[in-house]
Structure formats: structure tokens, C-alpha cells
A protein has these predicted regions:
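Mono-ADP-ribosyltransferase
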Residues: 6-221
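Hydrophobic, gly/ala-rich membrane-insertion helices/peptides used by toxins and envelope proteins
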Residues: 1-3
Length: 221
């Protein structure tokens, strides 16, 4: 597939594609700086209390607690779960649709090979297949689930694959730390069905993906 830098093969450092050079996208020097900005620009207590319904607040809060795995597994793989999971999904979906990114900004994520393969439309084996990974450069992929991200590199989970996400202003999602059942994760949560453009992939010496650079473009709902 195309995309800037997408026609080149894996170089000596294991890089396919290119890291976007977009200086206007917000990055923060520290987690404290990121938290202060997002509390002022990506969350609003009045909006939370009065614009969202009880079901929407419950859905988002449930995701930040113990239900995130069941909700995303059901959405991404179609696996049935507890009866109340669909209620949480519906509430979180409609609630997050009422929030948008306030500025072009960068967020971060760590994910395992399983969910990275799911996002890229492949198998875990293909996460070490150079031809398959190269074919993803420039492609638009959709996360059928909710995507948890950190607002600073220090708050991103450590996992098999490091994600850097350039989020365009107006993408559906919210800074959930003020209302989270796991405060201190400093999480920005993207709504389900967000579209991402693949800009860069980095692999290790064995050819396995270890880094993914995405651009969050819009939400398909």
C-alpha cells in the first residue's frame, strides 16, 4: 500500500514507512504537564454531570474498571460475554461520542501481539512477516473496540508493541482519569470504530513488530 515512505522496504534499523514530522501536534515534557492540560481541555465536570446520561457514565466508568477486557473482546472478536456487557458498550459508545479531541495531539499505548494483529487485520504469525507488515503502510485500519492510550510516554502500558498515535482534533474520545476507577493511569480513551492510518512500523532483529505509529483520523459513527 502507499503512503509517504510506504513504498520503501524495511531498512537496516527495521523501519518501514516514516514517523510524521508534525510539530503542531501537542506533546508534553512530563506526565504532570500532560495531566494539567487534559484536565483543562479534554474533560469538563459540568459536561460529565449534565450532558451524559446515567447509562453513558456507567458505561465509561465500567470500562475503566474491570470490564474493559470483556467489552473489547466482544467488540473485536465477537465473543459473547456477560449480559450486562452490551449495556456497558452501548453506554460508553454514546457517551464518548459526545466528546472530541480539543487539539491535534500525541498519545501513547502498549499492546500485545494479539491485539496488534487484530487491528492490522492479520495473524500473530504475520506480525513477523515483512511483506505483510510492509503492506500495512499507508493503510486505514479500524479498531472495533475502545482504544486506551496514555497522555505521556510514561503512562503508556509496557507491552510487545509500542504505539505512538497522532490524534487529529475532533476525533471522538475523552480524558477519563478524573472519573476513572483506576485513577493515576492518565488515560485518554478513543471511542470504538476509530479509523487510524498506519504511518510507520518498526521491527526487531528477528523481524517482529515492536513499534507502530498511527494517525487517528475519525470515528465511524
Amino acid at each position: 500500500m502507499g503512503g509517504r515512505g510506504g513504498s520503501s522496504h524495511r531498512n537496516a534499523s527495521g523501519v518501514m514507512g516514516r514517523m510524521p514530522n508534525w510539530p503542531d501536534f501537542l506533546r508534553f515534557a512530563s506526565q504532570n504537564d500532560a495531566s494539567l492540560w487534559h484536565e483543562q481541555n479534554s474533560f469538563n465536570w459540568d459536561q460529565w454531570d449534565h450532558l451524559l446520561s446515567d447509562a453513558e457514565r456507567d458505561g465509561i466508568r465500567s470500562y475503566t474498571g474491570i470490564w474493559y477486557s470483556a467489552m473489547n473482546t466482544m467488540l473485536r472478536e465477537g465473543k459473547p460475554s456477560a449480559a450486562n456487557v452490551q449495556k456497558f458498550i452501548d453506554g460508553a459508545t454514546s457517551g464518548l461520542a459526545k466528546w472530541q479531541t480539543a487539539h491535534d495531539m500525541v498519545t501513547f499505548r502498549g499492546a500485545n501481539l494479539h491485539w496488534t494483529a487484530n487491528l492490522l487485520g492479520g495473524t500473530e504469525t504475520q506480525m513477523s512477516d515483512a511483506a505483510f507488515l510492509q503492506s500495512r503502510i499507508g493503510m486505514i485500519v479500524t479498531d472495533k473496540g475502545f482504544m486506551s492510550t496514555g497522555t505521556h510516554q510514561d503512562s503508556a502500558w509496557r507491552a510487545d508493541v509500542k504505539y505512538t498515535i497522532f490524534a487529529r482534533k475532533g476525533v471522538q474520545g475523552m480524558y477519563v482519569d478524573p472519573i476513572s476507577r483506576n485513577k493515576g493511569e492518565y488515560e485518554f480513551l478513543f471511542n470504538r470504530d476509530t479509523e487510524f492510518k498506519v504511518h510507520m512500523i518498526r521491527t526487531n532483529s528477528s523481524g517482529q513488530i515492536i513499534e507502530l505509529v498511527l494517525e487517528a483520523k475519525k470515528t465511524k459513527r
